[in-house]
Each structure stands twice: as structure tokens, then as C-alpha cells.
Regions:
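Glycine-rich phosphate/diphosphate-binding loops that line cofactor/substrate pockets in enzymes
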Residues: 52-68, 93-99, 267-274, 301-302, ...
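N-terminal amphipathic/basic leader segments beginning at the initiator methionine
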Residues: 1-48
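An acidic, phosphate/nucleotide-engaging active-site surface
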Residues: 113-179
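C-terminal non-catalytic interaction/assembly regions of soluble proteins
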Residues: 92, 292-459
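Internal metal/ion-chelating core segments
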Residues: 161-243
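N-terminal glycine-/serine-/threonine-rich phosphate-binding loop
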Residues: 30-62, 293, 410-412
Length: 459
């Protein structure tokens, strides 16, 4: 056996190295992202000193009395703790003590976080000094307006009660809006009614990485309505270390940050691989989020390929209020229709009509059909072979996970692959070391047409 360069696993729960070995005849290619070195202290200071389209935070915060800092939760890999000491210093320069700062964790519908989540996210020192609140989307929300799309905006009451709202978030591929980050941080502090309407009221970007969509436009409106004044945007490398930082007016810098992510994390489709390995780090905290964000390369694996998913699932199944793990495609349809009816009643006939059209096209063969490489990918997606789920740590998960089979050792994975491949000694192996961050793209295939329709939209 020859060792592969080490992967990472267990985001927020150890962030440890994971060495893997392969038989000598296997041709292993690891598709590492092209990211710059981790940020230095001086680079972080400079980012705070030169925000985009705004005064420095120390000036923006002058004369403020109730500042609020919104941070994403542990389902996102954003290392807020790396910049938190510098942020607190900006507030100190404005005459604001840490004890006067409220930190609100934007949990969306993900449920209440574990007791140590805030210390993991912002660092133990900041957690000990600041006032901490975990958002509850079913309580403590107030209505502050309505968007031009007709959605009522319910938000955590701490937001309108504050006189300066600063966010810390990241920029990651996202199924509904193309990319997360920017105004999408606001979604995490909204009430359940607003979140439901957003998810069921818009057509998903469908994994196309296109941020020019109505879901994103409405989020932009909502961020303005709730008063998201300033944003600290971080981009990470495959080891969850921050490598790029932008501060200031998110509307001014967001598209540039997305362009950077698309280029730095661009990776090819596994067109001719015999084995495709997808590492769900750094969004491997739970099964709920790993199953949608970590499987993209596997969805596009060739029919004959063995598919391996690596995920720590440190918090077990996890939770999403709109897209729970227990739902399956057929059982999920009435629930989706009901929620869509609550969000936008006019959507239900469109949903039914769309499903009928898709069934007719499938049965008659009519309608536009993909050609060339796109057709190849669509055919490959029909593979029925299971995904081998490698769990580096012992965690409690359901015995049955649709489409997956759990394997608790790496030698066990190699045995399954060898059996899959009928004992072939020479195999082409493609490894995606941080698949939730990686942007699958080619110069000839339309990403939107390759979006896996069966993916759950957990975000």
C-alpha cells in the first residue's frame, strides 16, 4: 500500500488529518483547490482598515450603543474565531466593550446548537466576554417589513433592537442560490414563515452556481430591510483556514468573492474515473448536510465507477426544519406541496403541471434532450450502485441510509471497491478533498443542465 496525501475530517470536532492508503496499481489523482496561503495577522488588520464602500468599522461603530454580530453556525466552515479578536479591537477603538456586544448565531431552521458551539465558532475568549444568543426561528421573531416579492420579513428581535449589525460569513456553493454568503447570512436569523416562503417560493438555482436568481434578489432585499450594515466575508482552503477576506458593503464586493471561489475551487467532472472519492469536509458535521453538500462529485460519477463518500458526521444525523433526513422523495411530496401552498399558493398548480410534463417527456421521449457530453453525464447519473460511506469515527447513524452503505474502516472500503471492480488491478481514482467547496465545471458542459434534481435542498 502507498499513502495518499492526507485529507481532513471532523470539521469543528478535531479537524484532524486523515491518511489514506491505496493498492500500488491504482492511479490516484487528488483535485486540490488553487487557494492562496492562509491569511496573516497583518492581512486581517489591513482588511479591517480598508473596507469596501464603507468607513472602517471603528468609525462606523462610533456613538453606537447596541452592536450586534451575526455569525453562521457549525453547518458552515467559516472560522470566525480567527478574525474575532480583530473585530473586538475595532469595537474597542470605537469605545465599545466586549460585554456590550451581542453575538447572534444564525441557525436558520437547523435547531438549537450544542452548548459549546458558540465557543467553537467565535473562540472561547470572545464567547466568555460577549452576550451570546442562538437564533430560534419559531420564537422571539418580529415582523419588520415585506419584500417586493410579497414575502413578510420576520427576523430575530435582536436585529431591529441593535443600532449596528455586522455579519461574519463565508462564500460556498449552494444549491438554492448558486452560492451562499453575502445577503444569505440574513436567512439564518429569519422566522420560520419567512424561511419557508423563500425556499418554496423560488425556483432553485439547481447547482448551477448562478447567483443571478430571484431567491438571491429577495435575500438582498431582506438583508437591506433588516439592516445588515456591514459584512466580514471569509474564504477558506481545504483545511478550513481563511485565505481571503473582504469587509464592508456586501453588495459592493459579493460578486467578486463569488468569482474568486469559482476559479479557486474549480474542478473537473469525474468523466472517466473508475473510483470517485468525495470528502465531505469541511461541511461534514452531520448526515443531514453531508448528504446534499458532499455528494455532488458522486452524482456525476460514471455508471461503472465505485463511489466513496467520507464524512465524520460528528453530530450524527443533525437537523433541518424544512428538509429533515427522514423524508424520502415520495413521502416528501405532500409536505413540500403543503409548505409551498403556505408560501405561495399559486405555486401548487405549477408544481403539479411541471411533474406531469416531466413524466410525459420521460414516457414519450419528447422534449429537449441533452446531447454530447451532457447526454453522457445524464446517462451516468442513472447508476444504481450504492455509495460507500466511510465514517472515520464511531458515530450513531440510522442503520439504513437510502442510497448508501456504511463502512467503518478504510480497508473495508478498499475491499468493497475491489469487489465492485471485479478485482481489476489498475484503476483510475479521482479524489475531491473538500467536495462541498469545489465547483464542478468544464468548458463544454452547461452546469445548470447537470444539476442533480434528486438532491435535497438542505442549506
Amino acid at each position: 500500500m502507498a499513502p495518499l496525501e492526507e485529507l481532513r475530517t471532523g470539521a469543528w470536532y478535531g479537524d484532524r488529518s486523515l491518511p489514506l492508503t491505496f493498492p500500488p496499481g491504482w492511479d490516484v489523482s487528488t483535485l486540490n483547490p488553487d487557494t492562496p496561503p492562509p491569511l496573516s495577522d497583518s492581512q486581517i488588520v489591513q482588511a479591517f482598515a480598508h473596507p469596501v464602500g464603507q468607513l472602517p468599522l471603528r468609525l462606523l461603530a462610533a456613538q453606537k450603543e447596541r452592536p450586534l454580530v451575526i455569525v453562521d453556525d457549525l453547518t458552515r466552515p467559516t472560522p470566525c474565531a480567527r478574525v474575532m479578536p480583530f473585530l473586538l479591537e475595532e469595537f474597542r477603538q470605537a469605545g465599545i466593550k466586549p460585554s456590550d456586544i451581542t453575538v447572534l448565531m444564525a441557525t436558520g431552521t437547523h435547531g438549537l446548537p450544542r452548548g459549546d458551539a458558540m465557543a467553537k465558532k467565535i473562540g472561547s475568549e470572545a464567547a466568555a466576554q460577549c452576550r451570546l444568543i442562538a437564533h430560534d426561528d419559531t420564537r422571539d421573531v418580529v415582523r419588520v417589513g415585506r419584500t417586493s416579492f410579497g414575502s413578510p420579513v420576520y427576523v430575530n428581535r435582536e436585529v431591529p433592537a441593535s443600532d449596528l449589525v455586522v455579519g461574519i460569513g463565508g462564500v460556498y456553493p449552494q444549491h438554492s442560490t448558486g452560492f451562499g454568503g453575502g445577503s444569505k447570512l440574513a436567512l439564518g436569523v429569519l422566522g420560520r414563515r419567512s424561511i419557508t416562503r423563500l425556499h418554496y417560493g423560488h425556483r432553485s438555482a439547481g447547482g448551477s452556481y448562478d447567483i443571478e436568481n430571484d431567491f438571491r434578489r429577495e435575500l438582498d432585499e431582506i438583508a437591506r430591510i433588516i439592516g445588515l450594515h456591514s459584512l466580514i466575508s471569509l474564504q477558506v482552503d481545504a483545511g478550513r483556514r481563511p485565505v481571503r477576506m473582504a469587509t464592508g458593503d456586501w453588495e459592493r464586493f459579493y460578486r467578486e468573492e463569488v468569482a474568486f471561489a469559482k476559479q479557486a475551487y474549480k474542478a473537473p467532472f469525474p468523466i472517466d474515473a473508475d473510483v470517485v472519492i468525495s470528502n465531505a469536509y469541511p461541511i461534514d458535521v452531520s448526515l443531514t448536510f453531508m448528504r446534499s453538500k458532499g455528494v455532488i462529485p458522486l452524482v456525476h460519477a460514471p455508471t461503472h465507477a465505485s463511489k466513496v463518500l467520507i464524512s465524520a458526521c460528528s453530530e450524527g444525523v443533525g437537523h433541518h426544519g424544512l428538509f429533515p433526513f427522514i423524508s424520502t422523495s415520495k413521502l416528501d411530496r405532500p409536505r413540500r406541496a403543503a409548505r409551498s401552498a403556505l408560501a405561495r399558493p399559486g405555486n401548487v398548480p405549477q408544481m403539479v403541471a411541471g411533474r406531469i410534463r416531466r413524466k410525459l417527456k420521460t414516457r414519450t421521449g419528447r422534449g429537449s434532450q441533452p446531447t454530447g457530453q451532457a447526454a453522457t453525464f445524464h446517462e451516468q447519473r442513472r447508476s444504481s450502485s450504492p455509495i460507500w460511506l466511510y465514517l472515520p469515527e464511531q458515530v450513531s447513524l440510522p442503520d439504513r441510509i437510502p442510497g448508501m452503505e456504511k463502512v467503518d474502516s478504510w480497508p473495508g472500503i478498499l475491499d468493497r471497491v475491489a469487489e465492485d471492480q471485479a478485482g481489476r488491478s489498475t484503476l483510475k481514482v479521482v479524489v475531491y478533498p473538500c467536495s462541498p467547496l469545489q465547483v464542478l465545471a468544464t468548458d463544454t458542459v452547461d452546469n445548470a443542465s447537470l444539476a442533480p434534481p434528486e438532491l435535497q435542498d438542505a442549506d
